[in-house]
C-alpha cells in the first residue's frame, strides 16, 4: 500500500498494527503475571464485571479459558460461578471492575494496594487484605532458575 501513499500507509496501517501488538502483548503478559511458584501452569487471573468482557468475548475470564479452552464465550461466566470453589482452592485472583491494562500499570508501578482494592474475596479466600497483597507479591516475585 505504501506505493499509493506512504504517509497514509504509515499512519493508518503501520502505527495501528504496532500499537495493537503492544497492547495485546501487555495484556497477555498480565494474564499470566501471577505465577504460582508451586505449580507454574497455575498463573492466570479472572477479571469480572468489567466492560472489557462485553467487547472482547469474556477474554478476561482467563483462568476459566485455561481450564476449559473450548468453552463458548457466552458460557464462561456461568462456568466461573459453577466452579468458583475450584478457583478459591487454586487461589486464582479474581479482579472486579478493572481489566488487564489497569493490572499491568499497577504491577509495573508496584501499586499492590490498588490491586487489592479490586480483588474479589470469594468465599473468604483471604482472611485480610494483607494476605491478598502477600499472595500477589509472592506470585510476582523474581523466580530463580533451576540449577
Spans of features found by a protein language model:
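Cytosolic/stromal cytosol-facing helical appendages immediately following the last transmembrane segment
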Residues: 13, 19-147
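Helix-coil boundary and interhelical linker segments in multi-pass alpha-helical membrane proteins
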Residues: 2-12
Amino acid at each position: 500500500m505504501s506505493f499509493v501513499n506512504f504517509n497514509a500507509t504509515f499512519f493508518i496501517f503501520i502505527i495501528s498494527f504496532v500499537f495493537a501488538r503492544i497492547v495485546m502483548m501487555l495484556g497477555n503478559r498480565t494474564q499470566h503475571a501471577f505465577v504460582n511458584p508451586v505449580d507454574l501452569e497455575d498463573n492466570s487471573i479472572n477479571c469480572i464485571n468489567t466492560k472489557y468482557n462485553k467487547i472482547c468475548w469474556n477474554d478476561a475470564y482467563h483462568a476459566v479459558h485455561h481450564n476449559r479452552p473450548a468453552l463458548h464465550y457466552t458460557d464462561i461466566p456461568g462456568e466461573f460461578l459453577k466452579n468458583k470453589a475450584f478457583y478459591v482452592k487454586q487461589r486464582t485472583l479474581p479482579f472486579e471492575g478493572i481489566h488487564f491494562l489497569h493490572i499491568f500499570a499497577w504491577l509495573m508501578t508496584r501499586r499492590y494496594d490498588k490491586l487489592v482494592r479490586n480483588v474479589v474475596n470469594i468465599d473468604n479466600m483471604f482472611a485480610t487484605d494483607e494476605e491478598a497483597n502477600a499472595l500477589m507479591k509472592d506470585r510476582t516475585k523474581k523466580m530463580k532458575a533451576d540449577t
